[in-house]
Amino acid sequence: PVQEICLWEPENPHLYEIRTSLWKNGEMIDARVDITGFREAGFRKDGFYLNGKKLRLRGLNRHQSYPYVGYAAPASMQIFDADILKKELGVNAVRTSHYPQSQDFIRRCDEIGLLVFTEFPGWQHIGDEEWKRQAVQNLKEMIVQYRNHPSIILWGVRINESQDDDVFYRETNRVAHELDDTRATGGVRMLKKSHLLEDVYTYNDFLHDGRHPGCNPKRKVTPDMKKPYLISEYNGHMFPTKPFDDEEHRTEHAIRHANVLNAVAQEPDIAGSFGWCMFDYNTHKDFGSGDRICYHGVMDMFRNPKLAAAVYSSQQEDTPVLELSSSMDIGEHPGGNRSGNWMITNADAVRMYKNSKLIKEYHREDSPYRALAHGPIPVNDFIGNAIVENEPMKPKQARLMGQLLNMTAYYGLNNLPAKFYLLALRLMVCYHMKPKDAVALYTRYVGDWGTTSTVYKFEAVRDGKVVKTVIKEPMQQAHLEVKVSAHNLTEGRTYDMAAVRIRALDENGNVLGFFNEPVQFEVKGVLELIGPKTICLQGGMGGTYVKTTGQAGEGILTIENAQTGKICEHFQVAREE
């Protein structure tokens, strides 16, 4: 017997080997080793509990899809995706929408402590009786094959987004509980108040469209308030966002994810939520933008992060995060307005400098997203004390003038609030200022045109130390950043692959969102290229893959762009004996 069991938890995913042998007449005729963990996972009416502790699920949906090869990616790529979810995006859960996914992916979730909601395959359609019998068989096979994975906390036993079918779904729930009475069942639907036969009411909540609240309260969705409730999808098709969309669109995409996360965090009886989705993916003719690509991800197809990815990664504490929603180029904004600029960070504070002059120190309490551990913080001051220090005005007049100019920058001339006009009237009456005076000051302190280049610097501060710095200034030089998932590959039960993620950056490490130049690939040695030899970056991002060919040795991938030059990545390939 196992003594003093170490429980499996996200922060300490302790695993055990279970060795099983089959004996006949004193002779062992078969044996196997399974890896599993010990934990108690359960849903209650007020949320999800792991080992007796309440845990809010914050996850993303994942398709098992890759550029050029579809679902035919080996173990290394499955592992890579799990690592991205946990270590880059900082989520604590994933939904394998809408089918069971690679054992290699789920095994990696076991190893790194990533919680999993998995379900049997299907989407909206329910067929005839023969079809239903096959669906039940699919469910049986899924549970038998996957039930030893401690990361799996919920079985999906309803065809995703299908209509109610009580006879069918009573059977799927019966089978699931018969084969595994330790896990709850759920059933993803887009229907409110539908027939609840599962243990958990799981619902795709697409209420938020930029105007409506981030989510429905539980009472408006589930027919039984005593049963647990979970949001299985949100956003996604409500606001498709391409990497090469303009800055305002990309920012709105990120803020919508923050809106939903914040709304869910304010509802104590919602177990958690899964955003749609982890990355963009190939799709059928009815979706996409005429190119059969769903731009629903917080990452692009190659797993390069969009701005929205930072909303998730900023909720973890292990890695410093600081992303600016803006390049600080006024020409990217209609009318030159700088409204809607955000700092997405997990820092305690962010110091903002303009041409080495401290403008303002922002704190996490300045975020309107009070329910999040680290909500996005609006940039609402471009002036600081500059007018007080540089203009021949009375201190109070200078401060009022600064407020006026910041309001103009934040709201834009066509959306100014009533308090702006009251403030302008006060400056005119009390200090005899004229509109042309304000225009001149705006040009000097906010507009940034006709003067020397403006350099903005943002410092993320944690525990009194600067942990990350972002600099925004007019781009002088572009270069390619290349990130390779692994340089050592192994030809084993299948070919092996390496993901190559590419971004065009300026000299300060900022993504060049409109660098859509061609990039050429050349492979030498024991590797093959997956995909075309030439691509065009989209939104300054792209990628490729290389694969093994059955041979051991060295391989070289050359990446070339006419503007940035060549980069060579070297690989070593071994064969598994």
Task: Tell where the protein language model's regions lie, with residue ranges.
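Secreted/periplasmic carbohydrate-active enzymes, especially glycoside hydrolases
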Residues: P1-P100, R107-R108, G113-V116, N138, ...
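Substrate-binding/catalytic cleft of secreted carbohydrate-active enzymes
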Residues: D81-K87, A93-N341, S356, R364-D366
